[in-house]
Amino acid sequence: MTDPGNSLRIEPQPWMVESATLAVLDALAAVGVVARFVGGSVRDALLGRPIGDIDIATPAPPQRVMELLEKRGIKVVPTGLAHGTVTAIAGTPPRHFEITTLRRDVETYGRRARVVFDADWAADAARRDFTINAIFLDPDGTLHDPVGGLADLRACRVRFVGDPATRIAEDVLRILRYYRFEARFGSGLGDPPARAACRAMANLLPNLSAERVAQELVKLLDASDPVPALRMMQEDAVLSVILQEARRLDRLQHMIAIEPEPDPLRRLAALIEVDGPAAGAIAERLRFSNAWRDRLEGLAVPWPLDPRADDRAQRRALYRLGAERYRDLALLQAAEGSVSRERLAELLAIARDWTPPVFPIAGRDITALGIPPGPRVGRLLDAVHFWWETGDFIADRAACLAYLQGLPPPPY
């Protein structure tokens, strides 16, 4: 962590002084508007992690912010005027700045709230979700920490701002966000008041849209090690509400230890123990894309890969399954414990080094022999393809045509 010591000040980071950031800040400062960085960019900068989009807080009302930015030729999108939020897009490549007016939430209705804009930085911090997201940073590097986020960041502690139950009632998704933040920033132990509130209010999770649940689940699974947070979710009776099929934390832990890179969908396949139709039902329930649904179904048990077969059989499996599915299945077998580390390395090397060839003939080669289009063409093509595949893909076009001409004509 970039430690500010007792001065509550850090050296300005490169992202704070890049041209796009300065253009946005200068547009606001030109008329004396105060602007401070806040949220994930500040948190991640203090941890020395890469940052993405930049959040900025200001007392200026959103219409005034838009006017000042547009006057400088900066593109502005009114992403949430009712809640005081606009998005500025500046720089090359484009950088997004979410600029939100300081506010107090007067009434909340789930995700929605009736807000009042004001100039009270402490009140704005008090309405945020977690203390580590409520640290303000001036452009000169001065930190403002009204709710103790710096101490929590140092201690790897994820804590709600104020009363956890109140924060969750404002948006139930914060239950899932809490565990995701535990996976990214926590110690693995959890904050007892936060966990107690999540446990008590888990029955509200079915009210969330499937898309929001899926987004949080995928982000959680993409953490470097999500298992401690998932175990907390299991202990707190939260995981069973959103994914009752998640029973294989042991296999997921092994997957994380052997995988070459994180893959949230492959990790999900390791976490659940279901057949293809059940995997498809999970994907439908979570509103996954068709591609993700097909991929998850393809990684369901029973696994169509025998890791003990010889290399010739592995090439045939790789040809039929495709490289991505073959690698995923090999990793799942290893995570299950049925493949040694050494054998896994061999299987992954086959997938890396062998390029499946293209079948050298097509239906037109059969019709050129005088066989009319129809089922006979397909049966003959399948016969040659099977011979070519079982022969380890060695036969070239001439050999395939010779084999074709030697086949007896199939029955109608």
Residue ranges and their predicted role:
Residues 1-412:
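Catalytic cores of the polymerase beta-like nucleotidyltransferase superfamily
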